[in-house]
Regions:
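Catalytic cores of the polymerase beta-like nucleotidyltransferase superfamily
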Residues: 1-330
Length: 330
């Protein structure tokens, strides 16, 4: 059984003081405040989170009146950010989400929900554990701790419903598989492919952000394999990929602990695309996936290196000099 006091004491001191201050201010008004989401999950895993989100029974306007520096981060969804020194803490009012028709966000939200109702709208059991820093209560109605101990990613309730609400959630499941080295529970996994028509509705910018988190994780190999296997890449570009690429080249990506993003992208594109017109197709994908000009330049440079490695024996002296001058110029 988890020792809640030790869990709270494991929070780095600068964050702990801030979080306890916020929680006490809210509790003194007779309201509720809980630490929730990825920070609680990571604390249970023995990690040191750098971001902390809270949920509360207070309304956004009440929070704005209580705290001196508050930013209206997403006030239409009940979220504001409390600033304490240089630290920022997102705090969201308990809410119920009413209907999802665009596969991206709720059509309507209702405040006045209970903590229990609020947790039911969240994505995965491991992210729906609430920690009260004042009373040292740990609320886990969806068996998230058990799933964390089993290293399982499982949706709250029916995965088709959860993924149907927000098309980013299937990609987040794959991302967590890479970043946490967890396994996706079978029913949840099967729903990833079944809800591709919902995932297709999310913006390319949101996909870009999740792909970056996979690429820069400790184990990008498994996440990239799953994105390809579930045909997620194809939802955001019309470029044709290898139908069955070899995994050998991609496996080495996981060994590049400090590789820059451009090199990681080059490994991905070199794996996904046939060698014919590789650079042209790669540039189009990077544009479709909303990568910056700098990221694109880096990735294409590394891809050019890969191509020259493939055809090195066939290069004549003029081609070799051209390539070397390109490397020097870069």
């Amino acid at each position: 059984m988890l020792n809640v006091t030790k869990l709270i004491d494991s929070i780095p001191l600068n964050f702990k003081k801030d979080l306890e201050f916020i929680s006490k201010q809210i509790h003194d008004l007779g309201k509720e405040s809980f630490l929730i989401g990825g920070s609680v999950r990571d604390l249970i895993l023995g990690k040191k989170p750098h971001e902390y989100d809270l949920t509360t029974s207070m309304l956004p306007e009440e929070i704005k009146k209580k705290f001196k520096r508050v930013i209206e981060t997403g006030i239409q969804h009940g979220t504001v950010t409390i600033m304490l020194g240089d630290n920022a803490y997102e705090i969201t009012t308990y809410r119920k989400d009413i209907d999802y028709t665009d596969g991206r966000r709720p059509d309507k939200i209702e405040f006045g929900a209970s903590l229990s109702e609020d947790m039911k709208r969240r994505d995965f059991t491991m992210n729906a554990i609430a920690l009260d820093l004042i009373t040292e209560r740990l609320i886990d109605e969806n068996h998230g701790i058990e799933d964390i101990e089993k290293r399982l990613i499982r949706t709250i309730g029916n995965p088709l419903d959860r993924f149907g609400e927000d098309g980013l959630r299937p990609i987040r499941a794959i991302r967590f598989q890479s970043t946490l080295d967890f396994t996706i529970e079978p029913e949840t996994y099967n729903a990833i492919y079944q809800t591709r028509h919902i995932t297709e509705k999310i913006s390319r910018e949101r996909f870009h952000d999740e792909l970056n988190k996979v690429l820069t994780s400790n184990n990008p190999f498994i996440g990239l394999i799953e994105l390809h296997k579930n045909k997620i890449f194809e939802l955001f570009t019309k470029v044709n990929f290898h139908s069955n690429p070899s995994d050998v080249d991609l496996q080495s990506l996981g060994k590049l602990a400090v590789a820059p993003l451009g090199l990681r992208l080059a490994y991905l594109l070199n794996w996904l695309l046939p060698k014919k017109d590789l650079l042209i197709q790669a540039e189009q994908i990077l544009k479709d996936f909303r990568y910056s000009k700098a990221n694109t330049k880096d990735a294409l440079f590394y891809l050019d290196l890969f191509l020259c490695n493939y055809k090195a024996e066939a290069m004549n002296s003029i081609e070799t000099r051209k390539f070397l001058s390109k490397v020097v110029a870069y």
